[in-house]
Structures are given as structure tokens and as C-alpha cells.
């Protein structure tokens, strides 16, 4: 997912969900009384979600660090937002074995939207998030996909000889919670395992509607990891096959291009956790050490 400019203009789902979640949790986050909060964002991509929705929440003296595993994304964001004060971008693989020393234990807050489903070693990533927070405490707000129809589409495309060469490692690009029968409980346990004893985990059932074939194709082009592996003259064929599978899954509404819509029902993990032992009880609807899990029957 390295097409930064395309992603900047085709991440409607990410923007929609990030704004709703930040609006909901802004008053819950533990903001410093001196206004000198340091916040690191994991998986900032092109930077527009971070700058449009996260930065406005920071106190005026707050420091912001946006990170991404893609150097191209970091370069794009650094250039696009170079005039922003108290803001910088740098490369970071949140699944790395050892955090860069200059980042470890330096932050009051960590946020991450639509990134952790790319990380197969979730426990390692959560351990790094825990260690990014200051020793005296801090909090994190995380949102990522537990499941999405796109993963099933990828698996079907891989069975096609035309695309299989480019998709041998398809499982590496499927959320580690996609096959889980209890993603909320599983993620909650991972948080406990790395030290986040106090946390709230929800699984939200959502549906996003893509208006028209071109809108859906543009979104796929922005996030699909396989397109950059194949010749450019095959991209449109791949996207056409993608759309055909979506239609076969009964996720289409409308019969012609003018009123065609595509439904994307997905499960979203939303988690808030604090590193400190002190906890505000009214954050939760359940007693301490119990986690609220919505959308799981």
C-alpha cells in the first residue's frame, strides 16, 4: 500500500470511522494538565486522518509524531505537512523486535487507525505500543479490522491462475483476527498479556457503502498490496475480476452504473487502554478486569 497520493483521496472508510471514534473517546483520553502531551500515531499513511482528526485534539503545546512502515508514505506526509508546527513523520514498523531508542517510553498517547490488521504479530505490536508510552503511564486508542469481505475476495482471486503468482502470501495480508470466533475476547487477552490490565474492547458491526464501481476500484487500488507486484496493464483486469467476485457475493445493489452501490459489512475492533493502575471507573460499563464486547453473540 504505497500509493500515498491515491490513498490520500480514497480513504473514506478510514476517515469516517476515525472521526467517529475520536469524537467518542476524546474526553476519555488522559490529557496532561500542563498541555505538553506527546502523541505518536501508528500507521499514519498519507497523514490526512492524523492531521484532520487527531491533531486538533492535542493541546496547543502538544507534540505529534506520525509513523508508518512505508517510507513512501512518510515522505509524502512529511512533504505535504512540512509547515505544521510540533509535527514530524518517521518510518516505524510497529511489529519490530526492538523499538528505536528515541521513541521508547516517550509518549503520553498512542493512536492507530486501520493499521493493526496488517500486523500478523499482534502481541508484538501491542507490546511495542505499551513500551512507547511513558513509564509513568499513558493511554492508547486503537481501531482496526477484525474481518472484512475483501479478505475473502483476495482468497478467491488467489485461486485464479492469472493472479496466483502475485498472491502466494495472501494470508499475510488478512487480519489476524479474521478467523477468530471471539475477536473481542482474543484481543482483550493480548492486551492483558502485554500489560494493559485496564482496557475496553468493542467489536462493532459496520457497513460502508461504496457509491459506484469507480469509487470501489479507487479504494481497492489505494489499499491492495498485490497491484504493485503486477504489470500496470493488468491492473484493470484485476479490478474487474475483483468487482465480479463482489457481485457474486451479493454485495451489490443496483444494476447499472448510475445507481450501482457496493456494500462492505465489516467488524471493527475499537480498543482503549491505559498503562497506569489508576483508572476512571465510569469509562466502562463493566467492572475492572471485565471487557465490554459489542456485536458478538
Swiss-Prot record:
Indicate whether Methyltransferase appears among the record's keywords: yes
Q: Provide the tissue specificity.
A: Predominantly expressed in corpora allata. Also expressed at low level in testis.
**In the UniProt record, does the keyword Transferase occur?**
yes
- GO MF annotations for this entry? farnesoic acid O-methyltransferase activity; methyltransferase activity
Q: Which UniProt keywords apply?
A: Methyltransferase, Transferase
CDD domains in the cross-refs: AdoMet_MTases (cd02440)
Class of this enzyme: transferase
- Which domain of life does the protein's organism represent? Eukaryota
Write out the catalysed reaction.
(2E,6E)-farnesoate + S-adenosyl-L-methionine = methyl (2E,6E)-farnesoate + S-adenosyl-L-homocysteine; juvenile hormone III carboxylate + S-adenosyl-L-methionine = juvenile hormone III + S-adenosyl-L-homocysteine
Q: By its UniProt entry, which Gene3D superfamilies does this protein fall under?
A: Vaccinia Virus protein VP39
Cited InterPro entries:
Methyltransf_12, SAM-dependent_MTases_sf
Record-listed E.C. numbers: 2.1.1.325
Per the similarity annotation, which family is this?
Answer: Belongs to the methyltransferase superfamily.
Known function: O-methyltransferase that transfers a methyl group from S-adenosyl-L-methionine (SAM) to the carboxyl group of juvenile hormone acids to produce active juvenile hormones in the corpora allata, the last step during juvenile hormone biosynthesis. Also able to methylate farnesoate to methyl farnesoate.
* Stated name of the protein: Juvenile hormone acid O-methyltransferase
Q: Which organism is it from?
A: Drosophila melanogaster (Fruit fly)
Amino acid at each position: 500500500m504505497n500509493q500515498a497520493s491515491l490513498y490520500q483521496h480514497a480513504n473514506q472508510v478510514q476517515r469516517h470511522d476515525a472521526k467517529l471514534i475520536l469524537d467518542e473517546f476524546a474526553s476519555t483520553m488522559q490529557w496532561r494538565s500542563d498541555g505538553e502531551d506527546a502523541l505518536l500515531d501508528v500507521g499514519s499513511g498519507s497523514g490526512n486522518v492524523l492531521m484532520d482528526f487527531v491533531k486538533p485534539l492535542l493541546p496547543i503545546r502538544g507534540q505529534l509524531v506520525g509513523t508508518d512502515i512505508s517510507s513512501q508514505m512518510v515522505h509524502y506526509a512529511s512533504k505535504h505537512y512540512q509547515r505544521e508546527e510540533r509535527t514530524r513523520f518517521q518510518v516505524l514498523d510497529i511489529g519490530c523486535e526492538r523499538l528505536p531508542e528515541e521513541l521508547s517510553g516517550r509518549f503520553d498517547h498512542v493512536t492507530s487507525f486501520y493499521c493493526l490488521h496488517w500486523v500478523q504479530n499482534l502481541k508484538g505490536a501491542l507490546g511495542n505500543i505499551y513500551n512507547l508510552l511513558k513509564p509513568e503511564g499513558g493511554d492508547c486508542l486503537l481501531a482496526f479490522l477484525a474481518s472484512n469481505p475483501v479478505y475473502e475476495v483476495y482468497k478467491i482471486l488467489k485461486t485464479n491462475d492469472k493472479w496466483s503468482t502475485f498472491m502466494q502470501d495472501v494470508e499475510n495480508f488478512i487480519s489476524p483476527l479474521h478467523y477468530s470466533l471471539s475477536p473481542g475476547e482474543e484481543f482483550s487477552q493480548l492486551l492483558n498479556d502485554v500489560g494493559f490490565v485496564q482496557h475496553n474492547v468493542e467489536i462493532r458491526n459496520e457497513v460502508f457503502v461504496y457509491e459506484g464501481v469507480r469509487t470501489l476500484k479507487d479504494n481497492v487500488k489505494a489499499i491492495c498490496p498485490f497491484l504493485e507486484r503486477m504489470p500496470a496493464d493488468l491492473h484493470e483486469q484485476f479490478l474487474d475480476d475483483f468487482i465480479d467476485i463482489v457481485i457474486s457475493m451479493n454485495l451489490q445493489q443496483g444494476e447499472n452504473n448510475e445507481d450501482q452501490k457496493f456494500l462492505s459489512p465489516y467488524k471493527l475492533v475499537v480498543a482503549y487502554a491505559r498503562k497506569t493502575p489508576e483508572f476512571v471507573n465510569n469509562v466502562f460499563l463493566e467492572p475492572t478486569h471485565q471487557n465490554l464486547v459489542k456485536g458478538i453473540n
